[in-house]
Amino acid sequence: TVAAALESGAITGNEHYQCNGSLEVGGHTIKCHSYRSGGEGDVSVQDSIAWSCNVALMKIAATMGKEEFAKFQQIFNFGLKTNVDLAGEARTASLLFPVDQMGSADLATNSFGQNFNVTMIQVASAFCSIINGGNYYQPHVVKKITDENGNVIQEDNGTLLKKTVSSSTSELLKQYLYATVSDGTGKYAKVPGYSMGGKTGTAQKLPRGQGNYLVSFIGFAPVDNPQLLVYVVVDEPNAEEEFHSTFAQEIAKGIFEETLPYLNIYPDEDIVVTEETDPAEAPADGTTDVPDSAPEDSMVDQTPDIAEETVPPEDGLQPQDV
């Protein structure tokens, strides 16, 4: 949403928004994760990502309009096959709102990832283009094939398919995603010594009363020259309270810790020692951190047209349709 708004010229990145915890859109009260505490207050464009502020994202999408929003969904290849070299990839066009059927409430909830579905490979491919300067490459599973002597038989050097955003928009998004990991909802994925960026996700699953969630984290390192992207989704974490995205962050952190040295990617930041927090005690991403909060009503009152099995994430990139 933010990348599309910046690229379309709907925002400059200098805007600020007031979050009082909820927003009335199309006859519906759509809530932010901080609604029980009165909202986030003054929220910058960077904060809308770093803090996962639904209200700010809804206002950004409204400024952009549904036509531009739908156009950029297609630019990022949502609803289209990626043609990754794996069998069975399905089209997901029917899981997105056509622009002529997208109402104001649909646009509002779509702005933070609810009410449309994309695959993990679609998310990863689009996300890579956002952080690499705007270049969307054909995704592949295997980089190269060698014989028993190490001779390369076949190698994929990357096929550039299109440009999604400008290099200036990409630089801004990397800055915002860096803030998410350094001081936002993604700080539990931080590996000491490495500059990292990322985004958290929290998806409510129906029926909401059962308190089941799908949580995710997508992150990259290092920030200036991204070399590694990790995307983790945890379906119904084995915990009393499932809605903490920190469960996915902890897994992602472990992968980063093992993989960065293996790839000879060296630390690029000073190590700062911080106090560890148990993921189960951390504030939920996309859900209020007030203990008496009921996850089942943390999103939309009278939500229309919700999928039968899951509700897409209320705060970020869509981890469904695995």
Map each language-model feature to its residues:
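Beta-lactam-recognizing serine transpeptidase/beta-lactamase-like catalytic domain environment
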Residues: 3-234
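Short, solvent-exposed mixed-charge patches
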Residues: 319-322
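Short A/G/S/P-biased low-complexity tracts
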Residues: 18, 314-317
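Short, gly/Ser/Thr-rich active-site loops of penicillin-recognizing serine hydrolases
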Residues: 151-157, 249-309, 315
